[in-house]
């Protein structure tokens, strides 16, 4: 007899349309799209872009995911997985208006929204209210900034997810040139 394989339970799922990041600028939209996909490739562990692909982050009970490595004091002595990148030129990120990594805030906003709907404990101190994130409700807009000095601005402009459950969860990103689908499963 073959036992049924347990199916994953989807706790939340949302999609980010990569064709609508900057609707008024084709060039800007391409930069945002490229930087979003590159950030996901770093999570996957292979920064060479190729499509489509899947990237996953598994969080055990009590584990934390931080979008970038500069952490607030309350997270410094905990088990933390980070986005494995600094969103800088040396890692291949493209600039827009002089800022390398433009677009990763849109990815962080998708993560905030989906993780919140899944019941994860979310800490996002810097809202992206200075510019809308198309397709993401305003309350989940998340501003990300990495500074090498690790100062308070970079620690506050981070996204932290904590698994409050007594079971592990996975963030599963399915990415293509057109969209990023994120689901949180148990």
Protein language model annotation of sequence segments:
Residues 1-186:
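Well-ordered beta-sheet/strand-loop patches within structured domains
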């Amino acid at each position: 007899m073959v036992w049924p394989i347990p199916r994953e339970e989807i706790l939340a799922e949302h999609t980010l349309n990569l064709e609508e990041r900057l609707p008024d600028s084709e060039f800007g939209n391409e930069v945002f799209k490229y930087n979003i996909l590159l950030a996901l490739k770093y999570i996957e562990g292979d920064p060479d872009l190729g499509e489509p692909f899947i990237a996953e982050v598994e969080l055990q009970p009590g584990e934390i995911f931080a979008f970038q490595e500069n952490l607030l004091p309350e997270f410094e002595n905990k088990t933390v997985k980070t986005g494995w990148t600094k969103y800088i030129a040396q890692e291949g990120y493209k600039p827009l208006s002089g800022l390398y990594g433009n677009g990763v805030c849109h990815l962080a906003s998708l993560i905030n929204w989906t993780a919140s709907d899944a019941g994860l404990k979310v800490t996002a101190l810097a809202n992206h209210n200075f510019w809308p994130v198309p397709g993401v409700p305003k309350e989940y807009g998340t501003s990300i900034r990495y500074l090498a000095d690790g100062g308070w601005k970079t620690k506050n402009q981070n996204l932290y997810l904590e698994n409050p459950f007594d079971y592990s969860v996975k963030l599963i990103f399915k990415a293509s040139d057109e969209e990023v689908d994120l689901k949180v499963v148990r």
